[in-house]
Amino acid sequence: LDLRRAPLQRNIMLRHKIAKVTRDYFDENGFIEIETPTLIKSTPEGARDYLVPSRVHKGSFFALPQSPQLYKQLLMLSGFDRYIQLARCYRDEDLRADRQPEFTQIDLEMSFVEKEDVFAVAEGYMKRLFKEILGVDIETPLPRLTYTEAMESYGSDKPDTRFDMKIKDISDIVENCGFGVFADTVKNGGTVRAVTAKNAAGVYTRKEIDKLTEEAKGIGAKGLAFIRWVEDEPNCSFAKFMTADEMKAIYERTGAEKGDVVLIVADRKKTVLSVLGALRLTVAKRLEIIPDKYNLLWITEFPFFEYNEETGNWDAMHHPFTKPLDECIQYLDSAPEKVFADAYDLVLNGIELSSGSIRITDPELQKHMFEALGLSDEEAYAKFGFLTDAFRFGAPPHGGMGIGLDRLTMLLCGCDNLRDVIAFPKVSNSSELMSGAPAEVDNAQLKELSISIDE
């Protein structure tokens, strides 16, 4: 009965139109649609695999693909220059409004390309799609931000740029101030940063700011300082510790004026950016200042490694076939923090729509990446040998991306949940209500597969 509802039927029809425009556009641009296997070998790609037991090979399992990554690279090595597939993908991870355990990915790969070539094809697709589906003109080339720029200004690697409210660094202003929380944070290598909500003082009373403080603490902040400029003299939680010149400098740096609210967090840089990035979105929604439009942009130059404070190691942030930027390769062993990936995300209104990269084609560099992931030569060959062997016969430079069809449809439909654009979606506990899947199976089937269930 749910499928009879007009809104859901409208969304499913729009999904069909998006799929048709997709196939038409890529066909016209020389792409070949090729299906890749859905019963594959389990390889580490981040999330848990869905496993399928083999009846013929006792004790062995297939995995359902998290992406067609390895196969599409093999296609490039085989001479298929442009590949496209509306691929079914599976990831055994917790559900969110924008995540399902099985999903459809517009998967593409191109040979003899650099990042700019991938961007040109993807931007042409977005321009065509938005025009045909929504009648909206998308200006290209799309804006770009590096990962560092996005984090510094918006506190997110998938920023919503439909509104301003950028993060400002005031560490240099407060490093010697009388307010110990600020001064000590800077002295100990942390940072103090702020966002300004214009004309928000009437909405954000002290009680409302207390709610923001609790939200900030829930994300990891120790507290939240603020300036609430209602009368001629701003109400400030720390003004008595500051000089007039220091307060003036903060107003100038943050652009604060009468009627504004300034939110300030002091902590480690990673925590500060994460907290202010989240508060920025909360406040913008509360003030209803986010315009109803579509802002697409590229995020580029992601860090290749992330420092793990628990283990003291540098962990790889991407799948092992992502190529480092050429100028960074020299730092792979000596300075991991200086290594950036030739990777890119396409972001729409604060939601990651697509992710991709230029791939490694040098066998020695590929070996180095496996080592960085903690894989021995034997482990790497056991998992990926069929691809690395192919590299030795010569590999064209290639790259590509995957665009989430479900997520794209959700955004173009104006929905907030993927379930609203999928005919038979999974619910929050990863079950499918229509058929009752997953379900127990007959003991005879389990015995045939040599599987026993621990109670």
Where are these regions (language model features)?
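Class II aminoacyl-tRNA synthetase catalytic cores and aaRS-like
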Residues: 1-455
